[in-house]
UniProtKB/Swiss-Prot annotation:
Native organism: Thermus thermophilus (strain ATCC 27634 / DSM 579 / HB8)
HAMAP family, per database record: Acyl_carrier
Role summary: Carrier of the growing fatty acid chain in fatty acid biosynthesis.
Protein name: Acyl carrier protein
Record keyword Lipid metabolism present: yes
Lineage: Bacteria, Thermotogati, Deinococcota, Deinococci, Thermales
Residues recorded as bearing O-(pantetheine 4'-phosphoryl)serine in the entry: 39
Gene Ontology molecular function, alphabetical: acyl binding; acyl carrier activity
């Protein structure tokens, strides 16, 4: 799976979970500051990414995922 394909899937999960327009989901976007997520939203977001990609993301690793780019790079490394 290419980085672009991962980004498209991540974008869809984020847009759905955070109820934001897909155009607002850029690589630079921060979940809390830019996309309006709260701590519960971020937990649901991580769970959505786990389901979408068939991964398990530990709480420690999840805390490091703060931007869309963080999520894409993490998933790419895990799938790699």
């Amino acid at each position: 799976m290419t980085e672009q394909e991962i980004f498209e899937k991540v974008k869809a999960v984020i847009a759905d979970k955070l109820q934001v327009e897909p155009e607002k989901v850029t690589l630079e976007a921060r979940f809390i500051e830019d996309l309006g997520a709260d701590s519960l939203d971020t937990v649901e977001l991580i769970m959505g990414l786990e389901d979408e990609f068939g991964l398990e993301i530990s709480d420690e690793e999840a805390e490091k995922i703060r931007t869309v780019k963080d999520a894409v790079e993490y998933i790419k490394a895990k799938l790699g």
